């Protein structure tokens, strides 16, 4: 096992193959296969054009599969430094490269899915399991709806996005940061990905560059939407750790 979090990550040693098995995400989403299928399709394209990504496995078909009821996909092992998280500036450069490559992706991806359908699923699960109250759920939904409208008005651009682009979803390699974990990929404005990246490490120079490209109002709206979007997931992760799921 490499990691057990939202998904179980397993190295099929000695083969250079990594399996990503939907565990917590399957519990919340009920059917994780569409997420995994979108991820494999997008990353297959990105690997083909040389973008900085962990590529699908070239030893076994990438899938996704369902094995004994578990949804999973297969990926190439990337030699990296597991103790190092890429710095925000290096990750920003790699994300720019990724966005340039994703503009050519010919497939269809749902608009801002992490904050739309996936938010609804996570919030419904949190409400069903009493991790949020009905009042909290209504408040979060109202805030989400208003911020979606605001971001749609301020940033109408639409292209393929990573969807969950904080620096821990990249690894440090000899070529620099390489991005992985695209199961939240979606379409929308690039400011969504950029806001996620700098929210935890708001380096002034990078924030200024994002404001120059997209405007401060769009960055603020994307940041506020991200904060609302992850709240149900934070509650779910906290419960998992406390209860040992």
Predicted regions located by residue number:
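Protein kinase glycine-rich loop
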Residues: 1-3
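A short, glycine/Asx- and small/polar-enriched loop/turn
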Residues: 5-6, 12-15, 66-71, 225
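ATP/Mg2+ or Mg2+-diphosphate-binding catalytic cores
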Residues: 23, 125-129, 135-136, 230-245
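Conserved short submotifs of the Hanks-type protein kinase catalytic core
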Residues: 68-80
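Active-site acidic catalytic loop and adjacent metal/ATP-binding pocket
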Residues: 6-13, 17-20, 56, 148-194
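Active-site activation/catalytic loop segments of kinase-like enzymes and analogous catalytic loops
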Residues: 190-216, 225-243
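A conserved alpha-helical element in kinase catalytic cores
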Residues: 21-68, 85-97
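A cross-family kinase active-site recognition segment
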Residues: 82-136, 156-158
């Amino acid at each position: 096992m490499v990691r057990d979090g939202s998904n179980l990550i397993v190295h099929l040693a000695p083969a250079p193959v990594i399996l990503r098995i939907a565990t917590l995400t399957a519990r919340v989403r009920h059917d994780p296969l569409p997420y995994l299928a979108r991820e494999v399709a997008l990353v297959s394209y990105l690997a083909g054009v040389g973008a900085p990504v962990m590529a699908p496995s070239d030893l076994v078909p990438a899938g996704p599969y369902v094995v004994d009821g578990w949804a999973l996909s297969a990926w190439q092992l990337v030699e990296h430094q597991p103790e190092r998280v890429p710095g925000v500036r290096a990750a920003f450069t790699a994300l720019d490269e990724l966005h340039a490559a994703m503009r050519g992706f010919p497939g269809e991806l749902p608009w801002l899915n992490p904050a739309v359908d996936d938010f609804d699923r996570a919030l419904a699960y949190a409400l069903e399991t009493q991790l949020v109250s009905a009042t909290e759920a209504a408040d979060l939904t109202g805030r989400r709806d208003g911020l979606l409208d605001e971001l749609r008005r301020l940033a109408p651009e639409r292209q393929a996005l990573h969807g969950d682009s904080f620096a821990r979803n990249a690894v440090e390699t000899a070529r620099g940061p390489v991005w992985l974990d695209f199961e939240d990929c979606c379409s929308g404005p690039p400011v969504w990905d950029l806001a996620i990246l700098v929210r935890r490490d708001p380096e002034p120079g990078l924030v200024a560059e994002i404001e120059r490209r997209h405007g401060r109002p769009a960055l603020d709206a994307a940041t506020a939407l991200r904060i609302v979007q992850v709240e149900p997931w934070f509650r779910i992760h906290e419960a998992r750790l406390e209860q040992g799921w």
